[in-house]
Amino acid sequence: MATVMKKVDAVIVGFGWVGAIMAKELTEAGLNVVALERGPMRDTYPDGSYPQVIDELTYNIRRKLFQDLSKSTVTIRHNSSQTAVPYRQLAAFLPGTGVGGAGLHWSGVHFRVDPIELRMRSHYEERYGKNFIPKDMTIQDFGVTYDELEPFFDKAEKVFGTSGTAWTIKEQKVAQKGGNRFAPDRSDDFPLPAQKNTYSAQLFEKAALEVGYHPYNLPSANTSDSYTNPYGAQMGPCNFCGFCSGYAC
């Protein structure tokens, strides 16, 4: 017989980053919330403790933090004439499992969505004509604009402790070395300065500048200094261990 639980205001299925943030926002708004997560409980300690976390066998080979694709996966096809087949080999798309989801093993690359990406269909039709996009391609414009989302991008960067270098703030150029001149305008600076460049990054920057390109510091949700976010979570600075994507950090 099924167990009848106490009624709540909201049930969140999946307690990754999105689910966790939704639960916090709803709880602070006064709702009684329950979150359901099929994966294991994970926490900063011991799951993300250093140096235990730099274990290539556990994380890179045995894929501890990723979903078991033999049990649950998505299907993929390249066009409507093909038969969709299950995604069975992890590549660039790395779905996480357990509390924290993919946020636990995310490398921290933290670009904002470009305004063009939010109106992708219109952009390409304006540029290349109505017949450019195949009929069976589902590409669509989003129902919101960059300006509508910008305050939430700003809040997210403050929650994640994003490190970076701004190019413009409120349409005023604040260009410093390392700023991205191609980035959309922002209402506030990054909460933390950009990460220090490694030696290889310095060599790349030098070579790119010499041939006329515009290299910039990568926005990174790995804190460049000690940081306490608006939720009260304390974060230590990145220690440049190099074990990023796929490892608990």
Regions found by a protein language model. Name each.
Residues 2-132, 138-155:
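N-terminal glycine-rich phosphate/pyrophosphate-binding loop and immediately adjacent elements
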